[in-house]
C-alpha cells in the first residue's frame, strides 16, 4: 500500500484512500456512501481505467468500519449505564469457587469503581468487607485490580474496561476454537459423518450457533441465584457486533462483492491489497475447478463436483484427506486477523497454502464466510437460487456490489431459466423407476417418478404440434399461464407442489434412522445420481417461481418445445478374418446418422424474477465501465436506482482517437448489415481497410466482428484472395476460436502477447475476435497490447433467435403496464452494450493511449440514433470522417506522436485535444471536452492521479489569446504527467510532425521535456509570482524584437524563458510541501481573440500598468487579493462532469441544477469533506463560474510586464513614449474585452470585485 494515503470524509464516513482520488472516484464514493446510509440502490458507470474498483472497495469498507466504531461506542455507553446496578458483589457458588480468578477481580473492580463514581462512599463500604474479600485484597490479582481501579476512577472514564471488554472475548473464542479443532472427537470423526451432520444442520463449524454453544460460559453450569451468567452472555454478545441482538442497530452487514469471472476477482483482490482495509476478514467463493487440490479430482476432466461428493461419502473405500484439514487452513495465521498479520489474499494464495497444509481450500473458503466482512464471488453465486442454497448464502440485510454488471440482465434471466432434453427426462424416469422397484424409499420415489412420466408423456404428445420455423427446426411456445394449466392436468398444482418438494428433500437424504434390535441406527441409503438430481432440482426451481406468490411470475415465463436434428457417429469395430480379406471399407466403418432432439425450455423473460430474491438486501450497487445505455436497468430489474452516475474518463482527449469510417480504401460504402456482409465487395473492402490500419499503427490491434459466422466468412475470403497472407507479413494474425478448451484459448493469447512483446520482423499482432466473445469480456489489453480497437458494424443480436424474438414481444406487451422499454429499443441497447464492451478493451489506465475505429456508414449518416448508445466518454469525442484517406492520415499522425516516444508533457504543451484534419475550427463540444467544470468557490485539491496544472508562462498574443487552464494542481508529477494547456495549434497538429527547436532552444542541451520534468517536480505552484530571472527577460525581449512569424517559434521562447525561471527559483523545501497549493486554470481559446485570427505575425504586448521588476505585483485584470482557505475542501460529483452543454458552461451555476445528468436522480445532495494534514492556501475568488483563473492570468501578465520593462529601458525616449502609449491603449481594450468574455457566468461576488 502506498504511504501517501489521502483521507476523505464523505457523508460522515472517513475514507482512507491509497492516493489522491480522481474526480470520478470522488463522485463514485459519494454516491456509494449516500446509498449505503440511506438504503438506496446505486447504478454507477465509470470507464475502465478510472479506478472504480478502488472507489468501490474503499467507500464500502470504510462505511462498514464506521458501523463497527459506532457499535463499539454504543456498547461502551450501555456498559457504563449498566454497571452501577451491579454494585454489590456476586455471592453465587460459581464466584466463590474462583475467588482469585481474573473474572472475579474484574467484577470487584467494576463494582468498586461504580460505587465510587456514583455514591462516593466506597471507603466506608470497604471497611465493611467480609473476611474472604479482605483475604482477596492481599493477592497479586487484587493489587493489580486496585491499580487499574484507581487509574480508571481517577480519570473518571471507562477506557480501560472498554478496551478489555473488546479484546477478551476474541482471545477466549480463539482458545475455544483451538480446543474444538484439536479434540479427539474432531480428529477421529469419519468424513462421511461430518458431511452428513453438516448437511442435516447438526454440525455448523464456526457459525454463530457453534461458537455460542462452545463458549466458556456454557462449559460450566449456569447460576440460577443471580444474573451473572446472563451478564456474561450480554458482554459476549456485545463484543460480537455482527449479531442482530438489538435489531438493526447492532447488525453489521456483510459486503458481497460479485464480479463476472474469477479472473476479475483476482484483479479486485490486488486492488484491496493497496488499501488501508487490506486487513479486514475476507473470503473468496469459487468452484472446485479453481480450488480443488485433490490429485485425482483436480486432474479429472469429468464432473469434479460428483467426484468430490463421492470422496466425501467414501463410496470406494477412500475418503478425502484434505477435507479433514479444513480447520488448519481456515484458522491459519495468514488468513486470520487476530495475529495482526492479515492481508488480502487471492485464490492462488489460498490454493498454495492449502497444498502446503494439506487442507481443502474449497471448504475452507466457505468456512471463512461466517466471519468475513467482505465476500468475493462470481455474481451468478448471488443470482442463481440453486447456487445460493448450496453455498448457504443469506443476503438478507447485506450489501451487494456487482461489478462488471453490464450483462446483469442476461445473467438474471439465465439464473431462473432451465432447459432439459427428452433423453435426460427419460434417464431420470428410468432411475426413479429402479429405486421404486428395489423398495428404496418407495413412497417418495413413486411421486417423483409419476411427475417425470407425466411430463415425458406430455412432451411426446406435444411434439406432433410443432411448427417449422427454419431448416430442420420446429417449435411450439406456451405462455407461463398456459403451462400451469398443463401442469394442473398432470396433477402438479400449487397445493401438491409443496408435497413434491418434501419428497425431493427426502430422496436426497443419504442416511436414514432405522430401528434394529431395539436401537436406532443410521443406515446409508442409496440416492439417485447427480445427473438425475440436476434434472429434478432444475424442474423444481422453475416450478417454484411459477407457483410463487399465487403465480405472480407465471406470465414472465415462456415454455418452448424445440425440435432439432443432431448427427451422431457410430464407431463400429472392424469385423475381419485373420487374412484381412473381408475387412470393411473405411467409409462403412464411420457411419453417421441423424437423430431427433427434443428440448424443453423454460425461459424467463423478466430479470426482475431473479432480483425478487434480493428484495431484502440493504443496498445493491451495480457498476461497470459500459452500462450505457442505462435506461433499461430500473425497469428490467424491477429495482429503483435512486442514485445514478455516469462518470468521465481520467485521460486527456489527446490520448484517444475516436473516429467513424463509412467508406473503405477503394471508396466503397461500408454498411455491415446482413445483405452487405454477404457480398465479396464488402469483404474485400474490410480486408483492405484492416491491412491499411495495420501498416499505420504498430504493436497490438484488436478487431471485433458481430458474429463468428462473419469471422469465418471473412477469413475464408481473405485466405482465398491472398489478403490474409499480406496481413501476416505485417503482423501475427490470430482469430478467436468458437468454443474449445480454456487451455487452447490461453495458448492463443500467449502467442498474441509474445508477438507484441518480442518484436521480430513483424510489427506486433492482430487479434480478430467477436463481440460477446471471450476476448471482449474481462480481458485486459493495456498499453501496447491494444493500440487500436476496430469494430466492424453494430453487433445486434440474432433477430431470428427464438428467445430474442420472444423477449421483444414480451417487452412490447408490457411496455405500458410495467414501464418496460419497447422491444425495438431493448434490441438496440443489447447491441450497444456489446459494442461498448469491445471498445473498452483499449485505454486501460491513466497513461494509456489508443485509437477507437468504428467502421460502419450508419454512424455518420444517422449519428443521433447510433452515437447516443455509446459510452459517455466515447460519444463526446467521436469525429466523423468523410473518406478513408483523411481518417487514415489523422490516425497515422496520432500514432506517430505516441509511438515515437514523445511524452505527454511536451505533447500537451502544444495541444489540448485531438481535432481531425477536416475540422477547421474547434467546435463548441470540443471546447467543452477540454475542461473540467468547477464551482466558482470550490478549489480542488488533486492527487497523484489527477491532472497537472498549467505551468507555462502565458503571453498576450494578437492572433491567439489562450485563457488559463482550470486543471487542478498540486499533485505529484511523473514523467508521464503533463498539463492540458499551452498555445493551441489545432489545425496542423494531427497531420504535421513537431517543428524542430528554434535557435533559442538549441542553445541549451536540455529538451523541453527535461524542462517540464524539472519544472513540474520543483517549481512551487503558487498564485504569488516570483521574480523573473534576467536571462528569462532577455530571452523574451529578443523574441519581441524579431517579429515572430509562427506560434511554434513563440512557444520555444516561452519554454526557454520558463526553464530559466525554473532553474533560478528551484525551492529547497521538500517535495511533499510543494503539493499543498492548488489553483485551477482553463485551457480553451478565449473568444476575444477571434477577430485577430487572420493576422500572421505574433508579438508580445507589454503591459505598462503592471509593476516593474522588484515591485510587489498586484492583480490588475480583476483586483482580487488571495485569501487563505480552510483545509477542508468541499466537492459534489456533478462538478467533475466535463460533458456539460455550452449553455450550461456560459451561464451561472444554478443550485437547482445540481444533478448528474438529464434530470436523473441527484447523486450528491450533501457535500462531502476532504480532510488532509497538508496546508492549503488557495484564493477562493480566483475562479470564475466558467472556470477561468483570472488571478493567475493577472500574475502571468505581471511577469510579462517585467520583461517588457527591461525592453523599454533599452529604447530611445521617443520610441519608449510611443510604445508606452500603445501599451496603455491595448491594455484598456483588453480589459474591456475581458469584461465582455470572462464575466459570462461570473458570480455576483466576482462582479462586485471587478467593478471596484
Curated annotation (Swiss-Prot):
Start-end of Polar residues biased regions: 920-930, 952-969
Keyword annotations from UniProtKB, A to Z: 4Fe-4S, ATP-binding, DNA damage, DNA repair, Helicase, Hydrolase, Iron, Iron-sulfur, Isomerase, Metal-binding, Nucleotide-binding, Nucleus
Pfam families in UniProt: DEAD_2, Helicase_C_2
Keyword Coiled coil: no
Protein role: DNA-dependent helicase and 5' to 3' DNA helicase required for the maintenance of chromosomal stability. Involved in the repair of DNA double-strand breaks by homologous recombination. Involved in the repair of abasic sites at replication forks by promoting the degradation of DNA-protein cross-links: acts by catalyzing unfolding of HMCES DNA-protein cross-link via its helicase activity, exposing the underlying DNA and enabling cleavage of the DNA-protein adduct by the SPRTN metalloprotease.
Domain remark in the UniProt entry: 4Fe-4S iron-sulfur-binding is required for helicase activity.
The protein's name: Fanconi anemia group J protein homolog
Source organism (scientific name): Gallus gallus (Chicken)
Taxonomic lineage: Eukaryota, Metazoa, Chordata, Craniata, Vertebrata
